[in-house]
């Protein structure tokens, strides 16, 4: 299994699939799966390519989800090796996407291949959902596939998203949820004027100070057993013309909340509106909801994955909901039990992104054993 995973991972890394350009990665995967009897369905939306592949029929539907797109490489002269050369040095595979997430994608594919070869008449459905739009807009990828499946009443019961979840050593963390993410673009209106004549103007920066203080010090909740407290950060702020003698006519503030299951996006919007009204601000606000929080508590998938990882690594992982958003938030909308599990995330999006190939081999073992155990237990 190890050599097959390494070979496929290197083949995928050599394709410069900057989001949302798949660069033929999914075609490589589809051809492999089709030879084993997987049904291949292409679900393209705009410039994004999506693959929905499945083997078997009926329930339970156990899916692996991942993405072929990667982030830009930046200054290539800073890399030890060309970022799309897939160099293997001292058991470490280098390249953009090695950890996020072409390595675990290769492990998924090979694990599914091994399982289907050994169990051609298995019960239930083994599926793979692969997109080329995760790292950028994430508008035409997994979310559109999920919408398509839900519209035709096609379920996913369990799903492992192959994001690099491990922190210090392989298998130490299983992500069983994520916080929600909502961003506000706030425009506070004033009256532009000369700084020497403040009585003829209205400075929106001065007017907003009380509101901004309340906004940044407000305690939304105390978190819970699964999530830390909701947090708010101002990401961007802008006012003025650049001149030192002009009172600005508008203040722009962009802030983001990473919120837990103790609040909702509606509660957040309502509270912010109350604060703005309290401070008597003339404003316009635009909200963008990136994803609602989700949580997969104890269940067959979580229990099975924890047991399998412990058996393979000799260490029991712990559950965690930290970090940013992922495509798991879309799959959770189907009512599926969803977790994220993959290799170390220490080098993702960095120069010299890399992954230990022994970890990839273990990752493939985990995925295959989960299939065996889940389909036997259901």
UniProtKB/Swiss-Prot annotation:
Keywords: Amino-acid biosynthesis, Cobalt, Diaminopimelate biosynthesis, Hydrolase, Lysine biosynthesis, Metal-binding, Zinc. GO terms for molecular function: acetylornithine deacetylase activity; cobalt ion binding; succinyl-diaminopimelate desuccinylase activity; zinc ion binding. Zn(2+) 1 binds at residues 67, 100, 163. Gene3D superfamilies: Zn peptidases (3.40.630.10). It is an enzyme of class 3 (hydrolase). Its EC number is 3.5.1.18. Its cofactor is Zn(2+); Co(2+). It catalyses: N-succinyl-(2S,6S)-2,6-diaminopimelate + H2O = (2S,6S)-2,6-diaminopimelate + succinate. NCBIfam families: dapE_proteo, PRK13009.1. Homodimer. Belongs to the peptidase M20A family. DapE subfamily. Catalyzes the hydrolysis of N-succinyl-L,L-diaminopimelic acid (SDAP), forming succinate and LL-2,6-diaminopimelate (DAP), an intermediate involved in the bacterial biosynthesis of lysine and meso-diaminopimelic acid, an essential component of bacterial cell walls. This is Succinyl-diaminopimelate desuccinylase. It comes from Pasteurella multocida (strain Pm70). The lineage of its organism: Bacteria, Pseudomonadati, Pseudomonadota, Gammaproteobacteria, Pasteurellales.
């Amino acid at each position: 299994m190890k050599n097959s995973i390494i070979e496929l991972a290197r083949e995928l890394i050599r394709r410069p699939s900057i989001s949302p350009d798949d660069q033929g990665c999914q075609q490589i995967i589809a051809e492999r799966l089709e030879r084993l009897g997987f049904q291949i369905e292409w679900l393209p939306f705009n410039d994004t390519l999506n693959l929905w592949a499945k083997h078997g029929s009926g329930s339970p539907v156990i899916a692996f989800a991942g993405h072929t797109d990667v982030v830009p490489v930046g200054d290539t002269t800073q890399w030890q090796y060309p970022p799309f050369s897939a160099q293997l040095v001292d058991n470490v595979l280098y390249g953009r996407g090695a950890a996020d997430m072409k390595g675990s994608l290769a492990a998924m594919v090979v694990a599914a291949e091994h399982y289907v070869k050994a169990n051609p008449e298995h019960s239930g459905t083994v599926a793979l959902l692969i997109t080329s739009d995760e790292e950028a807009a994430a508008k035409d990828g997994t979310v559109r596939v999920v919408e398509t499946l839900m519209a035709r009443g096609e379920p996913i019961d369990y799903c492992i998203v192959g994001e690099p979840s491990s922190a210090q050593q392989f298998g130490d963390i299983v992500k069983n949820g994520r916080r929600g993410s909502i961003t506000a673009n706030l425009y506070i209106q004033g009256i532009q004027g000369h700084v020497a004549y403040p009585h003829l103007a209205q400075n929106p920066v001065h007017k907003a100070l009380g509101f901004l203080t309340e906004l940044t010090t407000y305690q939304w909740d105390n978190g819970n057993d699964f999530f830390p407290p909701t947090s708010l950060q101002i990401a961007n702020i802008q006012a003025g013309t650049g001149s030192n003698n002009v009172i600005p006519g508008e203040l722009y503030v962009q802030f983001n909340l990473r919120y837990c299951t103790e609040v909702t996006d509606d509660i957040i919007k309502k509270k912010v509106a109350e604060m703005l009204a309290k401070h008597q601000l003339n404003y316009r606000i635009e909200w963008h909801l990136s994803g609602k929080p989700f949580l997969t508590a104890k269940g067959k998938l979580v229990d099975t994955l924890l047991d399998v990882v412990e058996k393979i690594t000799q260490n029991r992982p712990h559950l965690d909901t930290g970090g940013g958003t992922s495509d798991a938030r879309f799959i959770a909308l189907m009512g599926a039990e969803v977790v994220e599990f993959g290799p170390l995330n220490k080098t993702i999006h960095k120069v010299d992104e890399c992954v230990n190939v022994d970890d990839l081999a273990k990752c493939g073992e985990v995925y295959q054993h989960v299939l065996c155990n889940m389909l036997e237990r259901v």
